[in-house]
């Protein structure tokens, strides 16, 4: 698995990525070939965010293969709030309050699709500057803390270093 000895991550920058299934242009994609991970990214404004998003999918493979911390990820959402388990859904399935302020549950409607997309959006925004408001709610703090704990467990990061993806964690006063 990625993160172990002799495993590689290759990143390719391209002009376009076309999803052959639904003929949509994508900002990037990730995949595995044998024991190596690959990320393909479209050059442009969203390059950095897309890199973090696709990297999270690679990291997820390691976290889910070595820990059980994500097993109850859906339980981090308030009661009655479920993932749609599909990428295309109508706006009537969302409530604006779920995406803002102290009641934020998701980064955006896309993050409602699957738990893995929720985690990828969280890492994507956690790695970028100026996003503290995205993580102000109790639900988003729980999700971010679980994501960070998963990465620490999977990659044996038990030191006291605060990593970039942890910059928006609010830690209680001791």
Regions found by a protein language model. Give the residues of each.
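Active-site-flanking segments in enzyme catalytic domains
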Residues: 10-174
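Zn2+-dependent metallopeptidase catalytic core
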Residues: 1-8
């Amino acid at each position: 698995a990625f993160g172990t000895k002799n495993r590689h991550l290759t990143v390719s920058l391209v002009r376009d990525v076309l999803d052959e299934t639904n003929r949509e242009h994508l900002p990037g994609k990730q995949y595995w070939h044998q024991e190596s991970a690959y990320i393909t990214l479209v050059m442009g404004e969203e390059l950095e965010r897309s890199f973090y998003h696709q990297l999270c999918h690679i990291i997820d493979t390691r976290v889910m293969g070595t820990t059980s911390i994500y097993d109850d990820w859906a339980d981090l959402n308030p009661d009655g709030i479920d993932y749609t388990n599909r990428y295309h859904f109508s706006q009537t399935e969302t409530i604006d309050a779920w995406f803002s302020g102290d009641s934020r549950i998701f980064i955006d409607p896309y993050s409602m699709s699957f738990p893995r997309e929720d985690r990828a959006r969280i890492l994507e925004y956690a790695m970028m500057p100026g996003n503290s408001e995205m993580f102000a709610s109790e639900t988003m703090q729980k999700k971010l803390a679980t994501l960070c704990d998963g990465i620490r467990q999977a990659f044996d990061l038990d030191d006291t270093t605060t990593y970039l993806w942890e910059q928006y964690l609010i830690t209680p006063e001791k």
